[in-house]
């Protein structure tokens, strides 16, 4: 789980960087399918996240549009990794301080050891509103794609920007 002060630190970072955002508190959601109500309440593009580990032991956090189709076998070639599989929830908790359902690119705030490589789908970077969790699945915040990139760079995790989705 996220450290008690992680969300506070995250919002302090957003404020320091003057990131404009919308925030919606809601019931817990664990899957993209469960988040339909949020999609109607918040304009913009909604996301899904994959926490992956390659056979070399490297961890990857991949964020794409919620409706994107992702071929994990093809993804490894796009990001230059070895064979990929889904990372275990224990590793996600240890490295990113979050649990399944709360996955977000903003969780890199907790990866102080730099063990996770963040990958953002190219589509997200040009969007005016990208909706993501703020380290918990009971809220969603919307910020611009360019601000998302600025924030994760400020957190020491410059993302790899790749055409992740198939098609």
What is each stretch, according to the model?
Residues 1-167:
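Extended, low-hydrophobicity, polar/charged segments
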């Amino acid at each position: 789980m996220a450290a008690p002060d992680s969300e506070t630190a995250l919002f302090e970072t957003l404020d320091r960087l003057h990131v404009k955002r919308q925030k919606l508190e809601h019931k817990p959601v664990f899957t993209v399918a469960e988040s339909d109500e949020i999609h109607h309440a918040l304009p913009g593009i909604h996301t899904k996240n994959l926490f992956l580990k390659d056979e070399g032991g490297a961890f990857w956090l991949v964020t794409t549009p919620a409706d994107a189709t992702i071929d994990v076998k093809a993804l490894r070639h796009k990001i230059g990794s070895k064979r990929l599989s889904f990372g275990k929830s224990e590793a996600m908790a240890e490295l990113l301080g979050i649990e399944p359902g709360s996955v977000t690119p903003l969780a890199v705030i907790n990866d102080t050891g730099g063990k996770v490589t963040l990958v953002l789908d190219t589509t997200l970077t040009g969007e005016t509103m990208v909706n993501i969790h703020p380290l918990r699945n009971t809220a969603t915040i919307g910020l611009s794609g360019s601000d998302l990139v600025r924030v994760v760079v400020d957190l020491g995790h410059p993302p790899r920007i790749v055409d992740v989705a198939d098609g």
